[in-house]
A protein has these predicted regions:
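Short amphipathic alpha-helical coupling elements at transmembrane boundaries
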Residues: 69-73, 152
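Cytosolic regulatory regions of ion transport systems
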Residues: 2-35, 45-65, 78-606, 615-641
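Extended, composition-driven regions rather than compact fold-specific motifs
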Residues: 40-44, 71
Length: 641
């Protein structure tokens, strides 16, 4: 008996604390049960029954049958006055039970259902069967700006935006409220759930979505692992769907090592059968923003970053680009590597001594250099580098030779790295920066990438006066707000250019990812041109439809996709180097030949930075002797001739 009581109580409590329909089911079950008991008991009493004569009479009242009389008493107490005197005590019992069940419990349950519905909506517990919607999994500082971009982009129309997060729904709505107007705010749906549960992920209806952004939560220690695990579960859901198109998935990886692994190896090959997989990294994203798209924000608050080659580095030019990065933080390394992909110019084809230079300054440069050389070991197998110790009064220089190759097989790259150990605020390094400013042979840019934003601000504003007097661009990393630097670098037409007009903020946490797909489309077009040229021997005269570009793109390995993307990123610097700044024009044969050599130099750097290595002489013989061996070396050993 006790067991049955416990089971009944447990089931009752679970039902009444759950969804509203369960409460209604219980209530109607009780009502039906009570009414059936009343109906059975009523047979102990004589109820007036209608006769055939009474049914056919026109002006006579027609008495109701037993069942209908009981129903009327049960739901309306006023009907008790019509009951014969000998039934009034029984009728009173029926009326009281009806009052309790209908006027008491039913109204309470319905009111509770409405209150619970409102509460569940506020807490983000209601699931809606959406379709053609945008899904954002996770919530951090960049999500409100991402939503703003989606709402401003006519490509997305007025589709709903579903946000799944473990954070309180009210907190999410309040943060989004500051970015959106009332009309777009109605498009937001918040669902409080975890991204490591298949059951919770199925509620997102990703198989019917238009696009998915897997961002993750803020301040997670195992952010990348959770995102990968979440993506695996979503792919499993899509595998079970027979008619599911390839939906774009943009996935944030916090650590550059994770991001680099997905750039080189086809870890996502199985996933890409069911989804369009697009990884991105916060630091790589900001490096691309300031070096490739060169724009942050829109409207009056738009910041346009100057190119590193703000002077055309032509074939005849004697100048080289010099990028100085203060602080070997993750942001600093990302900017340095992105710059190495871009800084390739025609004058190196004429004079092999004119190379682009990327200099890192850090008080722990000796240790950070070892990490950097280990991560990009295949670059340093070929290229030499300079290391300077300026941490003390005396300056010590060390020339580091290539670790594997020498002679004609070494130092043929057109970009070199330098490492300086010391603090940028010391007099020795301040004087060195002055020398660089007044060196007419270089085009200088400085990026301050310290981890502590106030320290970055101080460093960016207290460089030698020569930096500001000569209008050298200074990029200063910030995290939360760029308001002060936006005011300092204001260059409206009605204002004179002042001391800090060439100091630019970057690295804000709320704005990293750009929805602009221009570079991706350019990469797809480059791939199409390569394929067309290989198949037919000439260049296509027109661009195919987007679906044809996508189909060809999705067949590529990840490393080849990134190769085409980096080639697309370098289009603007290449065109500037031959004097073209406005639009696209037809090139002559000499320009094509020159840019092809520049592209080959860029391609060499790209392969080394992505993780491929140069083969030895013995390996080259095997590679060129057999196509099968060549494929093995490229795809399994990451050796590229």
């Amino acid at each position: 008996m006790n067991l049955l009581t416990r089971l009944f109580a447990l089931h009752f409590d679970r039902s009444f604390s759950g969804k509203g329909w369960r409460q209604l089911a219980w209530l109607f079950g009780v009502i039906v049960t009570v009414f059936l008991l009343i109906y059975l008991v009523s047979f102990a009493f004589i109820f007036p029954e209608p006769s055939l004569e009474e049914w056919t009479g026109i002006d006579k009242d027609v008495p109701m049958g037993r069942l209908l009389q009981l129903i009327c008493l049960f739901i309306d107490p006023g009907n008790i006055v019509e009951v014969p005197p000998y039934l009034r005590w029984f009728s009173l019992l029926v009326v009281v039970l009806g009052l309790i069940l209908f006027c008491g419990l039913l109204i309470s349950v319905i009111s509770n259902m409405l209150e619970r519905r409102v509460e569940r909506y506020r807490e983000g517990d209601i699931v809606y069967p959406l379709q053609n919607h945008i899904v954002i999994i996770g919530f951090d500082n960049m999500v409100p700006t991402l939503i703003q971009q989606i709402c401003d982009d006519t490509h997305y129309g007025n589709c709903h935006i579903l946000i799944q997060s473990t954070q309180p729904a009210q907190e999410i709505r309040s943060k989004i409220h500051t970015e959106l107007d009332a009309k777009n705010e109605k498009r937001i749906v918040v669902l409080r759930a975890r991204r490591d549960s298949i059951e919770e992920l199925e509620k997102l209806y990703t198989t019917k979505a238009r696009e998915v952004f897997l961002i993750g939560e803020r301040n997670e220690h195992d952010h990348d692992s959770l995102n990968i695990d979440c993506l695996k579960k979503i792919v499993d859901i899509h595998k079970r769907c027979n008619k599911c198109s390839l939906i774009p998935f943009t996935v944030l990886f916090e650590y550059q090592t994770t991001f680099a692994a997905f750039q080189l190896t086809d870890l996502s090959a199985e996933w890409r059968k069911y989804i369009e997989f697009h990884p991105f990294n916060f630091y790589e994203g900001w490096a691309k923003k300031i070096l490739v798209s060169r724009q942050y924000g829109k409207g009056e608050n738009c910041i346009e970053y100057p190119p590193l080659d703000r002077e055309a580095i032509t074939y005849e030019s004697e100048k080289h680009v010099h990028l100085v990065i203060i602080g070997m933080s993750r942001m600093g390394v990302a900017i340095g590597v992105e710059a190495a992909h871009l800084l390739h110019f025609p004058n190196f084809c004429r004079d092999k001594n004119i190379k682009s230079v990327i200099t890192f300054i850090d008080e722990n440069a000796d240790r950070e250099m070892n990490f950097f050389c280990g991560r990009y070991r295949h670059y340093f197998e070929i290229s030499s580098t300079h290391y300077y110790d300026m941490s003390k009064d005396e300056r010590h220089e060390r020339f580091v030779l290539p670790t594997r190759f020498k002679g004609k097989d070494a130092d043929f790259l057109d970009v070199e790295f330098e490492f300086i150990k010391g603090r940028a605020e010391t007099p020795a390094i301040q004087n060195l920066i002055k020398e660089w400013v007044h060196d007419s042979g270089q085009v200088l840019t400085i990026a301050v990438c310290l981890n502590y934003p106030p320290q970055s601000m101080a460093m960016g504003l207290y460089l030698p006066d020569d930096v500001y007097d000569e209008n050298i661009p200074v990029f200063v990393r910030q995290e939360t707000s760029s308001a002060l630097l936006n005011m300092l670098n204001s260059k409206k037409k009605d204002e004179a250019i002042h001391k800090y007009s060439h100091v630019f903020p970057f690295g804000m946490l709320d704005n990293c990812y750009d929805l602009d797909k221009k570079s991706r489309r350019e990469g797809q077009i480059i791939n199409y041109i390569y394929d067309f040229k290989n198949k037919y021997g000439n260049v296509p005269q027109s661009c195919p439809p987007d679906n044809e570009l996508k189909d060809s793109w999705n067949k590529l390995s990840v490393s080849l996709q990134w190769s085409n993307l980096y080639s697309a990123y370098s289009i603007s610097p290449k065109l500037r180097s031959i004097g073209i700044t406005d639009g696209y024009v037809k090139l002559d044969n000499d320009q094509i030949t020159l840019l092809a050599e520049v592209e080959h130099n860029r391609w060499n750097m790209e392969k080394l930075l992505l993780g491929f290595r140069k083969p030895t002489a013995e390996e080259e013989e095997l590679i060129y002797g057999s196509k099968e061996m060549g494929d093995i070396f490229k795809k399994k050993r990451f050796v590229h001739p």
